[in-house]
Amino acid sequence: MNLNKHSERKFDLITVGRACIDLNAVEYNRPMEETMTFSKYVGGSPANIAIGTAKLGLKVGFIGKISADQHGRFIEKYMRDLSINTDGMVKDTEGRKVGLAFTEIKSPDECSILMYRENVADLYLTPEEISEDYIKEARVLLISGTALAQSPSREAVLKAVSLARKNDVAVAFELDYRPYTWTNTEETAVYYSLVAEQADVIIGTRDEFDMMENQVGGKNEATKAHLFQHQAEIVVIKHGVEGSFAYTKAGETFQAKAYKTKVLKTFGAGDSYASAFLYGLFSGESIETALKYGSAAASIVVSKHSSSDAMPTADEIKALIAQAE
């Protein structure tokens, strides 16, 4: 798939959705009740993907709603310092806050996240705050599934997708399923399917695709067959330690292994994977190589303390692949 048409456009990628605060436990191997020290980072899947792709050298913009307070200013400055354009970032004027995520790292196999997502600013992004002039400056618009969980954010995202299609902007959909945000699985399936059927690239875990299909134990063959009846050109399905698969509408199948690493935590892998996979496509690499980039980036991030700060450079990704092969 060629993502490099419209080279005259201002942005390679614009991501849409939440930007929040991650407070990651500094003290490892102990429960939250006993943890006294946390480090603050920018979090939220679309923000992390914006950060990850910017660190890889892409020209990136962001659309989302943040709080008009210290946390909101921290997020905006952090992203601007990475040369991420924040013209699409809206400040909430009604006192809503950004989401907070406290992470607990009991062991590499036992990590959890304590979320505060009630009445958060990002889910109050409105359709009126989506600018066609901004979106049409991008080659690719990336949608995060969590932004579909509630109105008015849901309608804002659907408008963004419609404007992307109107202006020949490719749509990438990162399923990003977070159960604490949704009301029920039927609702998730409806809105995930609605966007997936309009997306050119869909990325998610096998479990996330099962949520989209409202079933358990779904098969890749059936998933890709359905999506290729619609807009999809590439479907990426991740299977954890078993690696990941990419399918194309032309009938090709590619596979990449998961790279071994010393795991510190289990979160952040999906965002780094999506960032590096898209970077590979933008760089003109083969889909197989883009899969390797995604797997390597995920391996790097789970070995480090943060998600956003740990997003790797292209040299780090290539070095890990070379070492592993």
Curated annotation (Swiss-Prot):
InterPro entries: Carboh/pur_kinase_PfkB_CS, DKG_kinase_firmi, Myo_inos_IolC, Myo_inos_IolC-like_sf, PfkB_Carbo_kinase, PfkB_dom, Ribokinase-like. GO terms for biological process: inositol catabolic process. It is an enzyme of class 2 (transferase). It catalyses: 5-dehydro-2-deoxy-D-gluconate + ATP = 6-phospho-5-dehydro-2-deoxy-D-gluconate + ADP + H(+). Catalyzes the phosphorylation of 5-dehydro-2-deoxy-D-gluconate (2-deoxy-5-keto-D-gluconate or DKG) to 6-phospho-5-dehydro-2-deoxy-D-gluconate (DKGP). NCBIfam families: myo_inos_iolC_N. This is 5-dehydro-2-deoxygluconokinase. It comes from Listeria monocytogenes serotype 4b (strain CLIP80459). The gene is iolC.
